[in-house]
Amino acid sequence: YTDIKWGIWIWVLAGVAGILCHAPQCSLSDYYRQIHLFFLKGREGSELDNYKQQRAVYDSLSLRHAPFQKIFYYNDANYCKGQERRTPRFQAFFQLIKERFNGAENLPVKIKEHFLKGSRPLMKYTNILTFNTRAISLYASCLLNIPWLYLLVEITIMSCIYIYMHKCHELLCEECIQLVTEKELIQQ
């Protein structure tokens, strides 16, 4: 219980923290983790989905016979679309390796190792941006009787981590694109 009179500002703060910060951060963290697992363990060791694949499943379902599955795949397809839209360099890299090597499974070891070496340090940030750190921050701010502090942590600290992680991953993908194109030049 608190004697603070919450005005409209707390709802604005919560909306910004939840919709503009938390949701995109978790989405991209999940995507980067699945990408890392895909390059580490292959398709079987990852849940790396894409918009076209999920949309095809959605289109194949009947609203009448499978309403919950249809709703699920509609949301999942849009979730994937949002992840793909925010990762243009990864999308270019992934498309390039599909074209040149017929998929990541046939990627030369040097390029795969370079990607994993650059991706591995980013996994700590994906972990920070998922549930545990947020839960601890929320519980601590509530126990200290300053629950609005959690919202500020979400908007400031977590957003800075998200921006850094995103920038590093896109730069890594650009490096990998350069490695693929250099390898092509050497082979010609």
Q: What are these model-predicted stretches?
A:
Residues 1-26, 138, 143:
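Multi-pass membrane catalytic core of lipid/isoprenoid biosynthesis enzymes
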Residues 21-22, 31-188:
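C-terminal membrane-associated helical module and adjoining short loops/tails
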